[in-house]
Amino acid sequence: MITDGIMHKVREVYQLLRKEPGIIVGVSNRHVHLSREDLETLFGEGYELTPVKELRQPGQYAAKETVTIVGPKGAIENVRVLGPVRKETQVEISRTDAFRLGVRPPVRDSGDLEGTPGIVIIGPNGILVKEKGVIIAKRHIHMHPKDAEYYGVKDKDIVKVIVESGDRRLIFDDVLIRVREDFALEFHVDTDEANAAMLNTGDLVYIVEF
């Protein structure tokens, strides 16, 4: 039987293993990234996204525009479009969303779309039938190269992250490190993962070494 005393000792060990400072959490709700061509199909020729909220990652923003995504079993309205436009359209949803839509997306890094299921996207000016592009985003940490040097990691490394706040302390395994010059330090999880750990955007988590 695991006693409170044992759990207290375990938490003390985790605190010794964790790397300071903590990393800010960004909880990612379902959203869509659109290519230029697909943006114009959905919203009209020459259309430009309207930024309404800057995201923590430099140059990225939530747009005013929303779409409806439709799968074999259902639809979800008011799905936010994130900007700027990308080379390829990508739809990021949670596993809960996937059940609602009737699709079975894999857990993938952003941009890794080969072999992913398609979906229908409806905008005010048109409808897209995408043959691929739906993923459940792999949990990851964005880092600037200076952050990666500080934490002793490199691009594509896999680490563990501990959640110490709230009543659902846990460790996220298999967390991908993504390093780029235009990234800011942030731990990204989807809404299912955040709910499991009772995490909110702005909370802090810690990389741990074993």
Swiss-Prot record:
User: For phosphate, which residues are the binding ones?
Assistant: 86
Q: Specify the pathway.
A: Polyol metabolism; 1,2-propanediol degradation
| Protein location | Cytoplasm
Q: Which GO terms describe its molecular function?
A: acyltransferase activity, transferring groups other than amino-acyl groups; metal ion binding
| Annotated positions binding CoA | 27-29, 73, 80, 99, 195
* Location, primary (coarse class): cytoplasm
| Top EC class, one word | transferase
User: Residues that bind Zn(2+) 1, according to the entry?
Assistant: 31, 33, 92
Keywords assigned by UniProt, alphabetized: Acyltransferase, Cytoplasm, Metal-binding, Transferase, Zinc
The function of this protein is: Involved in 1,2-propanediol (1,2-PD) degradation by catalyzing the conversion of propanoyl-CoA to propanoyl-phosphate.
Task: Give the family this protein belongs to, as stated in its UniProt record.
Answer: Belongs to the PduL family.
Protein name, UniProt field:
Phosphate propanoyltransferase
Q: Which organism is it from?
A: Thermotoga maritima (strain ATCC 43589 / DSM 3109 / JCM 10099 / NBRC 100826 / MSB8)
Q: Which gene encodes it?
A: pduL
